[in-house]
Amino acid sequence: CIGNVGAYFTGIAHFIVTTHIAGCLPTVYDIPQAQVNSRCVFSNTLPTGPYRGAGRPEASYLIERVIDAAADQTGIDAAELRRRNLIAPDKIPYTTAFGNSYDSGDFPGAFERALALADYAGFAARKKAAKKQGRLRGIGIGCYLEIAGAFPEEAARITFPGGDKVLVSV
């Protein structure tokens, strides 16, 4: 996976990108084993920082494209292939192949609701009707799971520099 760190080095950009790629990669899918090899590249875009979502978009794009390619190669509907691989509610709490823990979530329930709201079952008919009118119609599916924080713990330091002073660094 290639992570875009932007136009110049900000000190921790490479760490943010690579950590989030691994943390986000399984998303909502039950993937028992995984390995990530990633590289960071400089580009003409904004520099990467903690608030730019670095690594998350790359990971989501990667896993969703792999699933779409597998669906194309096997002839299995893309929604069905995703459905078969979602983390079941009875597996929560769930630990990913990269050690992240999901403490809640009904991924199949949310997925089915999204498909119903999009009328995924009726898409083939809409596509056929659009083609008769000379229009092309497509549909895409993607699942996304946001991880909170890059580190498993937070840190603070309390020091007493002397006298009646206390210094708290967070």
PLM regions: where:
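Gly/Pro-rich active-site capping loops and adjacent beta-alpha segments
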Residues: 1-59, 122, 131-170
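N-terminal leader/propeptide and maturation segments of large enzyme subunits in energy/redox metabolism
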Residues: 46-122
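Cysteine-centered functional microenvironments
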Residues: 128
